[in-house]
Design a protein with these regions (language model features):
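Short alpha-helical DNA-recognition segment
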Residues: 18-37
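A short, Lys/Arg-rich alpha-helix, primarily the initiator
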Residues: 1-16
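Residues that mark the N-terminal boundary/hinge immediately upstream of a DNA-recognition element
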Residues: 6-9, 20, 46-49
Length: 65
């Protein structure tokens, strides 16, 4: 997946759960600006950040070869 696709999946999961960007940022311990950038695929983040966001939304990360 590209960073854009990951961001889109995060945004869709967040919206499906009725979580605002502000609430998501609070839950994940990051800024609203960072959440917006990740969701738009504009922000290169490490796997630890993706993991934190996924855990916040009860998502699973899957690595494929």
């Amino acid at each position: 997946m590209t960073k854009e696709q990951i961001g889109q999946a995060i945004a869709e999961a967040r919206k499906a759960q009725g979580i605002t960007i502000r609430k998501m940022a609070e839950m994940a311990g990051t800024s609203t600006r960072a959440i917006q950038a990740v969701e738009k695929g504009l922000y290169n983040v490490g796997i630890d950040t993706y993991l934190k966001l996924a855990q916040t939304l009860n998502m699973r990360l899957k690595f494929e070869n």
